[in-house]
């Protein structure tokens, strides 16, 4: 049986590190901090971690707690332009870069970043 992406990169520990590093940047980012209520950063962090773990072959906790991901629907209330997308991607690239190459080799790193780029582009819902 082929190993899942989730298991290949270290499972929950790796996703927790990526998401934690991402959310550590949010309060300091002038664009992103407007999108995330300060009183729910921990909740947002948990939801993103659970989503990514499930997407990449880990536990299905996200769906069991929140239902189908429906990313576009869940992000529709937020005005997301290329500016917000690029800020999100900048912080996510920094978070992914913080994971050592032994844990996240080049092939898996590229696959993860390609997905994150695609997802971020698909969530843009406003031209300006």
Swiss-Prot record:
Gene3D superfamilies: Globins
Binding site for heme: 75
Annotated crosslink Isodityrosine (Tyr-Tyr) location: 23-36
One Pfam family hit: Bac_globin
CDD domains to which the protein is assigned, alphabetical: TrHb2_Mt-trHbO-like_O
Modified sites of kind 3',4'-dihydroxyphenylalanine: 36
Protein family according to the UniProt entry: Belongs to the truncated hemoglobin family. Group II subfamily.
Record's protein name: Group 2 truncated hemoglobin GlbO
């Amino acid at each position: 049986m082929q190993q899942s992406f989730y298991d290949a990169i270290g499972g929950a520990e790796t996703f927790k590190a990526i998401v934690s590093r991402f959310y550590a940047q949010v309060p300091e980012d002038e664009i992103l901090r407007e999108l995330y209520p300060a009183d729910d950063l921990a909740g947002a962090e948990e939801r993103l971690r659970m989503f990514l773990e499930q997407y990449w072959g880990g536990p299905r906790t996200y769906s069991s707690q929140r239902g189908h991901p429906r990313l576009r629907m869940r992000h529709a209330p937020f005005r997301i332009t290329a500016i917000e997308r690029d800020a999100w991607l900048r912080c996510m690239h920094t978070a992914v870069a913080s994971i050592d190459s032994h844990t996240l080799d080049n092939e898996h790193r590229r696959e993860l970043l390609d997905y994150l780029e695609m997802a971020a582009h698909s969530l843009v819902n406003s031209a300006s």
